[in-house]
Amino acid sequence: MTDVSVDPFGTPLVYPEGEPSVTTITNVWEPGFESPWHYHPYSGPAVVISGELTVDFDTESSLDNVTSEKTSTRQSVYKAGDSFLAISNTWHVSSNQGSEDLVFMVSWLGEKGQPLVVVKQ
């Protein structure tokens, strides 16, 4: 990843309006793990340390609709050593479809006291 001003979908980066806060999270997922459908209000740089991260995006569902079924309309796969800008404000489900543990890290560029994730109900 180099100097970027748009996310992987071409949406311009937007910085939080409140008090800035950077939260770094390291995840370790066993093979077969799958997150629930969710979205992040913020973006941030991410890196896959080992394994493979598969992300299915629903680019058509409204963020306001937290109860309806979601459908994958786009997929991205990131392998060990890949870095990318995590997508904000787009429903997605993330999984480890590989045969080894997935380890990845994300540094969320958010707002102090605000949630980093909204989960489908």
Regions found by a protein language model. Give the residues of each.
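Short beta-strand His + acidic residue motifs that chelate non-heme Fe in jelly-roll/DSBH
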Residues: W37, V55-D56, A86, H92-G98
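Double-stranded beta-helix
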Residues: S5-P8, L13-V14, P20, V66-T67, ...
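Histidine-centered catalytic micro-motifs
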Residues: S35-G44, W91
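Short acidic-glycine-tyrosine-enriched beta hairpin
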Residues: E19, V28-P31, F57-N89
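Structural recognition of the beta-strand scaffold that forms the well-ordered cores
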Residues: P45-V48, V55-D56, S83-A86, V103-W108
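Short, conserved beta-strand element in jelly-roll/cupin
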Residues: V28-W29, P41-S61
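Extracellular/periplasmic catalytic domains that process cell-envelope and extracellular macromolecules
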Residues: E17-P20, Y39, V47, K70, ...
